[in-house]
Amino acid sequence: MKRILITGGAGFIGHHFVVHLLKYTDWEIVVLDRLNYASTGFDRLRDIKVFDGNRVKVFTADFTKPIVEGLAQELGQFDYIVHMGAETHVDNSISNPEPFVIANVVGTMRMLDFARLQSNLTQFVYFSTDEVF
């Protein structure tokens, strides 16, 4: 069975992606999310897990920090990583850019570091923002 890691899987787009994967694949889905203000999402994921709790595992962690060995072992190996975890509400970055740089730049670097440890990884997908134009 294929395994996929989704950062930001409790967010608005992320949880819809989890639902899509549950419906159209037999993959094991692992969600890594900070569950901060933007993701009222544990409620979203709880509702999904009722649908198929055996295939969805949720880990709460801050991916802007290096993924420690214990968490890396618990997460395991993945065939795919979809990185959509980010600081949202981009208009707030005008007055306070630091959290956005940390989450959106440093967080992506940390996920790429984690991806290098994956011996089975075939694809790393990065979601950007609807504010890029």
Where does each model-flagged region fall?
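N-terminal Rossmann-like NAD(P)+-binding domain of SDR-like oxidoreductases, especially those catalyzing
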Residues: 1-133
